[in-house]
Structures are given as structure tokens and as C-alpha cells.
Amino acid sequence: DVCSSDLNVSVRIPSVFNVIKVETAGEMNKAIKKLIPSQDIFISTAAVSDFKFEDKDTHKIDSSKALSINLKPTIKIIRQIKELNPDIFLVGFKAEVNISKEDIIASAKQQIKDAGTDLVIANDVSDENCHFGSDNNKVWIVDDDIVSVPLSSKKEIANIIFDVILEKI
């Protein structure tokens, strides 16, 4: 099963997958709660927003005066996965901006600690060759080991990630 939002997805998902369309973090959370108990592997590629509007206006906002917007944190979906299915093999992604390799790896290891991920794919999206929407990337695959994947096509990286997952399960 694939739970997806069309907001930022430009990849064609093969028809062998059951696609569940969602628009909000809440909808994704609800769909995942139904799916996770019956799955063996969960690859959490979604970049779910960390914040949402605290209040929604139901009327037109007056543009003649200053405006303050209050945000509140959204639920961290990935942190619920192991609670729903302790035996699932959980793969997370960690995108960072303008930080060192050591800090990216530390951030990935923190996700392993916080969410119970078995494997984290980490990268720096501020790199001009590896930004969101780019066809290429360079990543670190992190668990007890660290595999550095140099600049490669995203398809090549996906194959490497799947090879690592298959070695681990």
C-alpha cells in the first residue's frame, strides 16, 4: 500500500500498489493507523509538515492591518509506527539543511532513538546537486553502520536502499 499526497509528488507510482490519497497530516495519520498493523516494512518517505495553523479563519482576512499567524506542531506520525506494530521494519528519512556530515548522521541517529526507526536515510537538501526535485542525491544510510552513497541518480539510490533493507530483514 502507498499512502500519498499529490501536493509534492511528481513520481508515477506503479499500478501494483494500492494508492491511498491524503491531503493533511491528520488524514495521513488516520490512514497509516489502519495500514501499519498488517505490514512487515514501512518506508516513511513523506515530508509531513511539522506545523499547522492553530486557528482557521472562516471569513476573508482584512488586508489593511498587520497579521500574525500562530502555528502548532503536528503529530509526529513516524513516532507512532512501532507502537502500532513493534515488529515492523521501519525506514525513516531525515532531510537537513546546511549542516555537516557529522551533524546529519547525529540527526539520523536521534531519529532512530526517538522513533525507533531501524534505518534512516539522511541527506542535506541545501546541496545544489541534491535539492528537492533534483534527479540526483547523495545520502547516508544510517543504523549501527553508516553507508555513504555518493552523488547518484535517485533510482540508483533507491536500489541501494532496497538492497540494504533486504540485508537487514
Spans of model-derived segments:
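Short loop/helix-cap segments at secondary-structure boundaries that form the rim of catalytic
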Residues: 10-17
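Contiguous, function-dense segments enriched for cysteine-driven chemistry
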Residues: 6-10, 30-33
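Glycine-rich phosphate/adenylate-binding loop
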Residues: 87, 104-169
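Short, small-residue-biased leader/transition segments that mark boundaries at the very start
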Residues: 1-4
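Structural signal for short hydrophobic segments within the conserved structured cores
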Residues: 18-20, 147
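Glycine-rich phosphate-binding loop
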Residues: 22-93, 98-125
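Flexible loop/turn segments at secondary-structure boundaries
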Residues: 12, 99-100, 129
